[in-house]
Amino acid sequence: MILYHASTMYHLLCCIVHKLAYHPNDAAELLMLEYIKPDKSRKSFLKQVIDSGFFTTARYVPEQKFKLKKGNALDNTSSEKEIKSVIENISKTFENWLDEDITKFEEIYVASDQHSLGIYLTSKSIPYHYFEDASGMLSEQSRYLSITKSNNMTNHIINEYLGCMGRNSCVKSKLCDLRHQQKGFYDEKAEDFCIYDILKFKIPDKVPDIINFFGGISHKIRGDKKICLYLTQDLNTLKIKDLDLQELMMTTLVDYMCGDEYVLVVKPHPKDR
């Protein structure tokens, strides 16, 4: 049996594509962070995931409840004993919640290993495969670390101590889109995982099912103009909360990249409201 873990809709896409391409006939369980969807739509979305048949079973990881059992918050002055205590609290809480023998899974694929599953696996020296957090992010870990540090210092301290984000010896491989990494990037554990290529060359017959699952709608754009596809960003995650600033950033980018010779097509971010 295979275990997949997703913390964002992008990660869910990675898990679905990987499952269909490399483990089409294997039973698989999917764990999703509860934050992947707003509270009011979680129940219906979980049913949608299960009904899709991509995975044998699926459930949410209640990270919010786990936070209450971590213990004291950590900072740069925390001792190793204090750090280990918090890690042990998280691991025990996750293990009790999982209520399964983790060794039954032949392979484990984890996205965002700085959360409870990744902390549990790393602290117990259990091997797993790591999905990069976003396309091209494996080569920009310093930027990613700065974001997580500003979001939660306790998590940052644990990340550094355990070597989360794919930086520890438990990691068997790092699945990433090699063409989108920074120039000169090299990692001996990096394995090319390009969703576009896999969909086009390995599982083209599954593309309609995947598009339908994510609510994709085909649009025919008429005319001779070139197409500019704009993928919006969840700026709130980057601590850019001012709506006027968000609007300025978006309009400036569109004005710069999309001239009159283009038709602008906007693909909303999954967290856009």
Language-model segments: which ranges?
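A nucleotide-sugar donor-handling region in carbohydrate enzymes
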Residues: 145-232
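Catalytic donor nucleotide-activated moiety binding site of glycosyltransferases and closely related
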Residues: 257-273
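A conditional alpha-helix N-cap/helix-loop micro-motif detector
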Residues: 87-91, 207-210, 243-247
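N-terminal beta-strand-loop-alpha-helix module at the start
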Residues: 1-23, 27-30, 40, 216-221, ...
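Alpha-helix C-terminal capping segments
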Residues: 120-124, 254-259
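Active-site and donor-binding regions of nucleotide-sugar-utilizing enzymes
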Residues: 3-166
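Residue-level signal for short, function-critical loop segments
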Residues: 34, 134, 234-236, 270
